[in-house]
């Protein structure tokens, strides 16, 4: 499956050139944003961890081994990219135990930067956002055109597609999900089941968003749309009055698309017509998600880019810094700028 099939059309027009992302881990840096005050006491030890070219699950296993606890005793808010330099929180459940020596978990790929006690464990999805520092190298694009495009993205956001990494190489996760859906069965392995259900829901959401990008309605509320605020999981129906809510214009409020599950879409009007049509095109996949017990949820169609800044450390390097809500993909921001080509190596440092 191609990127266009998995995501959909760009909203900003043709890419302005080409670049490399992730030539080295430092080119893709992620800092988890967690708005939880830690008490300094309790049976949970929270760890602020920096990892390089290491996925979250492997980091959790290493920390658990070093602490001498089962991996189920360690928690994290979300999964971060492997091919990156990331900083995120973990928590270890250590009732009645002293702080363990975690040095055995540390090497060039993992460092524990801070540890603090707290009364509660870290819950999945507890982080409010992720901060990104991206370095695009081997840049072949006009700076003036990039500056103008970036200014537009800052003002109007980008389509909130799920990024290609959600779907596996060539869309393999979607194809596997379709295979299981045709059999009306679920994988026995929990992690495989979770990955394929997530890929299927993400693919269907992208199909709806792609249609709305194509007709220009992805950032415009229509009567019958379900609207949501950037950081809220709740939503409400749009009537004539809601469609002119000034919070839409300042990127606080957005139309949403479906995260498929049990029951019909609660949307109405043109949104319901579109979502029903997409559901009929992928009936087996939708029924598979419903049978798996997934509940119908909503996701904003438009992704506001918080605190977007950029500069050029070298003529052929563009460095971007911005913040995105949890669960959103930095690569869909880059996609509106340039085409990415396979990674090579560069010697230019990342400037902060």
UniProtKB/Swiss-Prot annotation:
It is an enzyme of class 5 (isomerase). Belongs to the pseudouridine synthase TruD family. One of its GO terms (molecular function) is RNA binding. PANTHER family: TRNA PSEUDOURIDINE SYNTHASE D. Residues 157-303 form the TRUD domain. It catalyses: uridine(13) in tRNA = pseudouridine(13) in tRNA. The keyword Disulfide bond does not apply. Gene3D superfamilies: TruD, catalytic domain, TruD, insertion domain. This is tRNA pseudouridine synthase D. Responsible for synthesis of pseudouridine from uracil-13 in transfer RNAs. InterPro entries: PsdUridine_synth_cat_dom_sf (IPR020103), PsdUridine_synth_TruD (IPR001656), PsdUridine_synth_TruD_CS (IPR020119), PsdUridine_synth_TruD_insert (IPR011760), TruD_catalytic (IPR042214), TruD_insert_sf (IPR043165), TruD_pseudoU_synthase (IPR050170). The active site is at residue 81. GO terms for cellular component: cytosol. Keywords: Isomerase, tRNA processing. Pfam families: TruD (PF01142). The keyword tRNA processing applies. Disulfide bonds: none annotated. HAMAP family: TruD. Its EC number is 5.4.99.27.
